Each structure stands twice: as C-alpha cells, then as structure tokens.
Amino acid sequence: MSAKLTEPNFATLLQRFFTERLIHQKNASPRTVSSYRDTFRLFLQFAQQRLRKPPTKIELTDIDTTLVSAFLDHLEVDRHNTIRSRNARFAALRSFLQYAGLMAPTALGTIRGVMAMPMKRFERRLVGYLSREEIKALLNAPDLATWFGQRDRVMLATLYNTGARVSELISMTVGDVVLDRSSSIRIHGKGRKERSVPLWRTTANQIRLWGYVRIKAPAIARSSQIVPAVR
C-alpha cells in the first residue's frame, strides 16, 4: 500500500507563499511583500475574532466566501478603507488561495468559491489639478530659513517636476540623481519598474542648493535619501 500523501496546513502554506512563491519564485518587490504581509496581518486578526480560534488553529477550509466577504465588509465599514484598497487586499488573498489550491487540492471546493467572488466596482473620478498660481503658492509656502522648509521646497519641486508618487519620492537616493547639462532622476516605481525623468534647470539647482547632491559635494553615500524625514 502506498503511503497517504499529507497536505500542508494553512500556517505552512502561508509561510511558503511568502518565502517561496513571492520572494523566491516571483521575485516580488519589498513593497509588494510588505503590502501582502499587512493584508494577512489584518485578515488573521479578523479571522481570530470571527472564528474564535488562534491563527495557528485556522484551517484552509475556514477561508470560505462567508469569512472573506465579512472581512472585506469589515475593511470598508469598520476601517473606512476605500474600494480600491479593499480590492487590493482581496487580490492578495486570492493570490495566496490560488497558490494554496495547487498545494492542497482537497480544499479546491472552498477555494473555488472565493476565487469566483468579483472585485467591487467603483467610479474612477477625474484627477483634480491645481492652477499655475496655486502651484506657485504651494512651492513658495515652505520657510526657506529652516532646515525643514528647505527640504520641503525640494520635495515639492521634485514632485511637481517628475509627477512621482510620494512613495517613489521617499525612495529616491543620491545615486538616482544626475546633475549635468542633461540633469535627470531615476524613479523606482511599482513592480520594480524604473523610469528616468529629465529635471528642469530650476529643480536641478534647488537639489544642488539643498546640499545632498552637488557637483563637488563631500563624500555622501549614494544610498542616502534625497529628502530624509529627519535631520
């Protein structure tokens, strides 16, 4: 007689999903891994209260349409998440369940039900914008007599010039900036996608004056942030 094949439990599958699937096989970005981690932290906290059992006792078959629907409602109603954020959390759960179905086929019936649940539709509103005068007022708002004011001025000017997300701005380093006749900055976007954006002369000059990137700057680590949170 052949030995009975034992399927991995939920805890083992979740660990393998992060260490093997996301990090090793898919080479997911740290930002993606962090987002998925936060999703499951919220989900496990909710499931523990809902199922009245600790995360170590949760089984894969517990993650059914009833539990997932209640969790998504909890995100919107109790945590006041937007539909876009709610859908992002749901996408993380579905990604895990798709992997779990391959590793634990006996739970496919339950998993199939969750996978059949649709994403919630929402209105995609037009992006608002500021007038030229409003932008000038915003750029001139920081107090240049202070360290934080100088930093904020560079931050706003860079955002205006590049159209970068705040998360992308925070990750910009000294090594990403090129200051010469054709000044530019490299932006690290979602999904490990990089793009190079030209810098206007005014923006390049402000970065030089800020003191983090200068033609004859003292030795500063190329990995240093351009706009650090603190001094």
Regions found by a protein language model. Give the residues of each.
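Conserved catalytic core of the tyrosine transesterase superfamily
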Residues: M1-R231
